[in-house]
């Protein structure tokens, strides 16, 4: 076991939306979990790979111009090592895929709560995800909030990099396959499995 590392919930105000929702006592917040000087968060995109991304802790500018840092909430501590946390985040990425994002049922705050429960045994404070709870009771609210407005810019960058990596891997595999089949053709009796 490692040293006790603080587990911190960084909360960001989506200030342009809160101008409308604060009058009814509901804020719209983005959150991420900070541990070992790294912050992990979740957002949506249309692809079937992880929607989890990493930013510099508390840096709202990496999320985009509509986000403002609100506060840091210490949730507890963890004895997991940094390598363990990377594995946990990778495993959570199988559940928190970009195309599984749903504003009311699987959003950044749900991810933060899941990671916090694993790391220190505590959920995030309920007020942070209050909008998801209330809007699940009032279905028309879901249609009032476009999903693309709530995808942090840092995630867009992460998605672009993931797509570029997949494209390069596909090109490398295609080049290897064509080289392999060309050389396989010159050897009698050899079969190339694609």
Curated annotation (Swiss-Prot):
PROSITE patterns: PPPDE. Residues 5-149 form the PPPDE domain. It is an enzyme of class 3 (hydrolase). It catalyses: Thiol-dependent hydrolysis of ester, thioester, amide, peptide and isopeptide bonds formed by the C-terminal Gly of ubiquitin (a 76-residue protein attached to proteins as an intracellular targeting signal); S-hexadecanoyl-L-cysteinyl-[protein] + H2O = L-cysteinyl-[protein] + hexadecanoate + H(+). It holds the Pfam family Peptidase_C97. Keywords: Cytoplasm, Hydrolase, Protease, Ubl conjugation pathway. InterPro entries: PPPDE_dom (IPR008580), PPPDE_sf (IPR042266). GO terms for cellular component: cytoplasm. The keyword Isomerase does not apply. It is found in: Cytoplasm. Residues 163-172 have a biased composition (Acidic residues). Its main location: cytoplasm. Residues 173-186 have a biased composition (Low complexity). The active site is at 30, 108. GO terms for biological process: proteolysis. Its EC number is 3.4.19.12, 3.1.2.22. Residues 161-194 are annotated as: Disordered. The keyword Chaperone does not apply. GO terms for molecular function: cysteine-type deubiquitinase activity; deubiquitinase activity; K48-linked deubiquitinase activity; K63-linked deubiquitinase activity; long-chain fatty acyl-CoA hydrolase activity; palmitoyl-(protein) hydrolase activity. Belongs to the DeSI family. Interacts with RPS7. Has deubiquitinating activity towards 'Lys-48'- and 'Lys-63'-linked polyubiquitin chains. Deubiquitinates 'Lys-48'-linked polyubiquitination of RPS7 leading to its stabilization. Exhibits palmitoyl protein thioesterase (S-depalmitoylation) activity towards synthetic substrates 4-methylumbelliferyl-6-S-palmitoyl-beta-D-glucopyranoside and S-depalmitoylation probe 5 (DPP-5). This is Deubiquitinase DESI2. It comes from Sus scrofa.
């Amino acid at each position: 076991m490692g040293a006790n590392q603080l587990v911190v919930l960084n909360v960001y105000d989506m200030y342009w939306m809160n101008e409308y929702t604060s009058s009814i006592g509901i804020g719209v917040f983005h959150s991420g979990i900070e541990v070992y000087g790294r912050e992990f968060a979740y957002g949506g995109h249309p692809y079937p790979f992880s929607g989890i991304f990493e930013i510099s802790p508390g840096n709202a500018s990496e999320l985009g111009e509509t986000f403002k840092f609100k506060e840091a909430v210490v949730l507890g501590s963890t004895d997991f090592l940094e390598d363990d946390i990377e594995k946990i985040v990778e495993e959570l990425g199988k559940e928190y895929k970009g195309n599984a994002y749903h504003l009311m049922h699987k959003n950044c705050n749900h991810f933060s709560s899941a990671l916090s429960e694993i790391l220190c045994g505590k959920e995030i404070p309920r007020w942070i995800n209050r909008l998801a709870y209330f809007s699940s009771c009032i279905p028309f609210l879901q249609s009032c909030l476009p999903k693309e407005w709530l995808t942090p810019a840092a995630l867009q960058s992460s998605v672009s990099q993931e797509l570029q990596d997949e494209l390069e891997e596909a090109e490398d595999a295609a080049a290897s396959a064509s080289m392999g089949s060309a050389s396989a053709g010159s050897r009698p009796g050899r079969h190339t499995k694609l």
